Amino acid sequence: MKIVVVGTRGIPNIMGGVETHCEELFPRIAKKGFDVTLIRRKSYVKDSRSEYKDVKLIDIKTPKKKSFEAIIHTFRAIWKAKTIGADIVHIHAIGPALLTPMARLLGMKVVFTHHGPDYDRNKWGTAAKTILKLGERMGTKSVSYTHLRA
C-alpha cells in the first residue's frame, strides 16, 4: 500500500508541530512495511535527501508566501501523489484539507489529521479564517478517515 503525505513543510529537522508529528509518525509506519512518500516544500528544505528512515522524500517548488503557500503546495502534492500511484493521501492540517475533494475525485482514499483550529490564531485575517474553517469542514466531511489530534 502506497501512502503519500501532504500538508507538511517537510522532514527532517524542519520546525513546526505538524513537521515534528510527521517526523515521528511516518518512519514508524514505513518500518511496518508500508510504502510511505512525504512531499516537502522545497523552500524549507536544506538538504538533498531522497529518503529519511525508510520514508521517501519528494521536493516540490512552492512560493514562500504565507497566504498561498500551503494551498499551492497541496494542489501540486496531490497531483504528484496521483502520478506516483498513491493508494492513500494523508493530509495534515486544515488549510491543506481544503483540497480533500480533489484527492477523492482523483480516486485516492484520504486520511486527514486535524492538528488544531488554526483559524483561532491572530496571524490570520477574516478571509483566511473563513477559508481555514472551510478547509476544516472539507477535511472532516469528505475524507475516508479522520484523525483528530488534541
Residue spans for each PLM region:
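Extreme N-terminal starter segment of soluble prokaryotic enzymes
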Residues: 1-3
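N-terminal strand-loop element at the rim of the active site
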Residues: 6-14, 21-22, 28-65
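Short glycine-/acidic-enriched loop or helix-start segments at secondary-structure transitions
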Residues: 15-16, 47-48, 69, 99-101, ...
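Conserved donor sugar-nucleotide recognition element shared by glycan-biosynthetic enzymes
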Residues: 18, 70, 132
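A short, charged, and often flexible helix/loop element on the N-terminal side
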Residues: 52-79, 121-128
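An aromatic- and histidine-rich active-site surface loop
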Residues: 71-78, 82, 86-119
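Membrane-proximal helix-turn-helix segments that form the acceptor-binding/catalytic region
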Residues: 79-82, 105, 129-145
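Conserved small/polar residues in nucleotide/adenosyl-binding loops
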Residues: 146-150
